[in-house]
Swiss-Prot record:
[4Fe-4S] cluster 2 binds at residues 113, 116, 119, 153. Keywords: 4Fe-4S, Cell inner membrane, Cell membrane, Electron transport, Iron, Iron-sulfur, Membrane, Metal-binding, Repeat, Translocase, Transport. The gene is rnfB. Residues 32-90 form the 4Fe-4S domain. GO terms for cellular component: plasma membrane. Residues 1-26 are annotated as: Hydrophobic. It comes from Pseudomonas aeruginosa (strain ATCC 15692 / DSM 22644 / CIP 104116 / JCM 14847 / LMG 12228 / 1C / PRS 101 / PAO1). This is Ion-translocating oxidoreductase complex subunit B.
Amino acid sequence: MNGVFLAIGALLPICLAGGALLGYAAVRFRVQGDPVAEQVNALLPQTQCGQCGYPGCKPYAEAIAAGDKINKCPPGGEATIRALADLLDLEPEPLDAAEETPPRVAYIREAECIGCTKCIQACPVDAIVGAARLMHTVIADECTGCDLCLEPCPVDCIEMREIPDDVRHWKWPQPSPRLIASDRERAA
């Protein structure tokens, strides 16, 4: 029993000194980040897809904090653009896609899937479920359409399909910017 107390007595001062040293180092050598970039990064979807032209969400957040446009994130969509506009006190802008494409989700042709799990490892939002050497499937509500699962698939059994319009993601058209007759009378 004395050996246990002796070991505790010997290790306790070493642990306390190590903890104090780590605490001091954390305060002394702290890396100051941009708080605006951290807040912007928290709003981005963290898919690391690169569709915005940056290698990941953190570099894009830093670019937004430095003044870049807030409308380059297709997986985040309009909800992210509105949240960023509210945070930065900017006007929301329409999504700046290279070409206007409808929302898409990944679809795995399960009969062709060999269960290699490479698509699961590539998916940044864990929208693909399955096990090794068994078929995989995509949870459509979780998929952001980032296309990162397509390239690693060795049998090309993954395709991107357009999401059909329904009430959950249908967008109302913007009203016409022209004045209506009653507004013209008041303006005159």
